[in-house]
Amino acid sequence: MDQTATPLSGDVTPRPAAAAIAVAAIAVLIVSYGVNAMDRTLFPLMLTDVRREYGFDLSQGGLMSTIFTLGMTLAGIPTGYLMSRFSRKTVIQVGILIYSLATIITVTAIGFADMLFYRAITGIGEAMQLTALLAVFSSYFSRHRAAGVGLLNYAYAGGAAIGPTLGARLLDDYGTWRAPMIIYGVIGLAMMVLIAAVVRPQLSETNTAKQATTGIAAGGAASLKNLNTVVLVALSILFGLALYGYLGMYPTFLREELHYAPRDAGRVMGIYGLGVLISLFTGWLGDRFSPRLVLGLSFLLASAVAGLLFNGPADFTTQAALSFVLGATFSGTIFVNLAAYHVKSVTANLAGRASGLFVTCVYGSATAAGYVIGWIAGFAGWTVAGNIQLVLLCLAGAAIALMLRGDQMARQPKQGT
């Protein structure tokens, strides 16, 4: 056989080069989700300035802060279907384009109605990107799905840590909330171009349903209508209300109730993001231990921490430490494993639809989270609002998690090569 006669085709890449390209593509996708997180965490920090300029009350401000999740709700399940007709890479890029442009256009709003509309549109793009990324990482890391989602969640950690801190600095430097919004939108557009240049279909379009069965997770229900999915839907709804009650209005609580300066509030919210860095480890825990144990204990811990946040000391060190623990629990543990358990509850060919269902449930309930906690805070004070929307809902989640059946979820075959 003549080994010199046949040159490498465009589809044949030496293994070291292919590995380097894959690592670069994974890194770009991780950073792109970090930019998504930066965009999501920016507006709540700007809310005090927006309320001051436009005259919104607490409930209106709360709705404005979390209305983007309505867009995520509307886009979640349809995006799952879109991924069966278009490439995941394309869906990711279009999603980034939508939310970046909407973020920039928000600064042109003349009142409550049009700003609310622009903020909702950002959620459509963010949901498209998130749903496609969940499918990419769950499929590409099919042997360790929860750990794969945990790796993706490192992006959220970075974005959630950088976003509020950088946003507060830009707010101080430019003296207007509009400057950070425009700058973050431009960063998103740059990420869209980078993905086009770096991410290849061999990575983004991996489909475990088409692979050989050896080494692929076995089990899971053949339909979304199963006990585990129903329980996970309930948990996702409660989680969305609690998570975005915190993310949407906690910066306002810090600035208006505890009288924190913008930079201090941004630092506290950034420290929340650092708590998410344990997500790779907690994703591994989710692969190894019972979903009852992982989610039940996590919701219980979140309830205790939330109680201290809204009832305990108001000093910076205490609030920052508690926010770090809540970040590790909420976004670092519960989010990662809820997403993975949704996928593991069904067969591999339903991974995209399960991811879409997860996104829709979490962000559907989150749509009302800011309005509800803002209304309660305006009526009965921040302590009562935090106790109802975070403490009690997390306690309910801990109880409901006991209904999960880990033996009915997909699991990795013990033999391996």
Positions of predicted regions on the chain:
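Extracytoplasmic gate region of multi-pass secondary transporters
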Residues: 43-44, 228-279
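Cytoplasmic helix-loop-helix junction between adjacent transmembrane helices
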Residues: 118-156
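Helix-loop-helix hairpin linking two adjacent transmembrane segments in secondary transporters
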Residues: 151-199
